[in-house]
Amino acid sequence: MAETFKHTTVLLDEAVNGLSIRSNGIYIDGTFGRGGHSRLILSHLGPEGRLLAIDRDPQAVEVANTIDDARFSIIHGPFSELAEYVEARGLTGKIDGILLDLGVSSPQLDDPERGFSFMRDGPLDMRMDPTRGQSAADWLMKAEADDIAWVLKTFGEERFAKRIARAIVERNRIDPLTRTKALAELIAAASPIREKYKHPATRSFQAIRIYINSELEEIERALDGALTVLAPGGRLSVISFHSLEDRIVKRFIRQHSRGPQVPAGLPLTEAQLRSQGGPTLKSVGKMMPPDDEVADNPRARSSVLRFAERLPS
């Protein structure tokens, strides 16, 4: 098994409690990670309960395979395909709760060989599943400066995106970037102003990681899938770690809590209005980590937990 890196699960009890677990229910942990949420869910389930876990990181799947529990199964793949996994098992509309813990995990950040961190030197990879897709180094080598700048601005809200993108392209023409430390140093040198208490490469590394892993598109597909597979009364519990993620989750819950929006003045009969359907979700709440959790685990600082409940169709 790969080297073990510590992972402290954020909002562990709160996220699981928000699922209102029934002992014989069927649940999905869409982001197994190192199994913190999964193990707690299993502790609430009775003999007839079931937990389906998903993770696209092979190292996470290795850990999951050590769980010897007939109620538990693990799928190696992206959580965006959860509706397909559920349909293949004949469980569409029967899922009692889904938990998604978004973003990169501590073991992924802490392992320099994964290439996620600007604080530790390693290969410039950043793939959550190293067996699929192109690495960050490969993409940066092929991409145009305008495309890199767009990614840095869109997914990292990096104010010096164009300057950094030009520096990356110029460097790759001479000496290709293959290590995280080299990229972090280049970004720092290209950034004329530094934010207090924040490394100048923070936003760019986040942006490149999000792009390489299609993270925002994955979230959108996973949320759509969750709505399809949840049973009436089923719960959705989602932890996000930055504003781009949380914005998607917040918008999704709000949109489906309102139901179809019919333009004012559109000449529809009452029957036609009813045929448009009503809301399919109910917002159940939002939580932030308590101060003591942030003190123990600084990575929890920016986390937001949102809950929703599936309404009958």
UniProtKB/Swiss-Prot annotation:
Q: Recall the GO molecular function terms of this protein's record.
A: rRNA (cytosine-N4-)-methyltransferase activity
Q: Species name for this entry? A: Dickeya chrysanthemi (strain Ech1591)
**Which family, according to the similarity comment?**
Belongs to the methyltransferase superfamily. RsmH family.
Kindly report the protein's main subcellular placement as a broad class: cytoplasm
Reaction(s) catalysed by this chain, per the record, are:
cytidine(1402) in 16S rRNA + S-adenosyl-L-methionine = N(4)-methylcytidine(1402) in 16S rRNA + S-adenosyl-L-homocysteine + H(+)
Subcellular location field: Cytoplasm
EC number(s) recorded for this UniProt protein: 2.1.1.199
Function, in words: Specifically methylates the N4 position of cytidine in position 1402 (C1402) of 16S rRNA.
* Record's keyword terms, sorted: Cytoplasm, Methyltransferase, rRNA processing, S-adenosyl-L-methionine, Transferase
Task: Give the UniProt entry's GO cellular component terms.
Answer: cytoplasm
The record's Gene3D superfamilies line, in alphabetical order, gives: Putative methyltransferase TM0872, insert domain (1.10.150.170), Vaccinia Virus protein VP39 (3.40.50.150)
- Region of interest (Disordered), ranges: 276-300
UniProt-listed InterPro entries: RsmH, SAM-dep_MeTrfase_MraW_recog, SAM-dependent_MTases_sf
Protein known as: Ribosomal RNA small subunit methyltransferase H
Q: Which residues form a coiled coil?
A: none
NCBIfam families, per this entry? 16S rRNA (cytosine(1402)-N(4))-methyltransferase RsmH
Output the HAMAP family linked to this UniProt entry.
16SrRNA_methyltr_H (MF_01007)
* Name of the top EC class for this enzyme: transferase
* GO biological process entries: rRNA base methylation
Binding annotation for S-adenosyl-L-methionine:
35-37, 55, 79, 101, 108
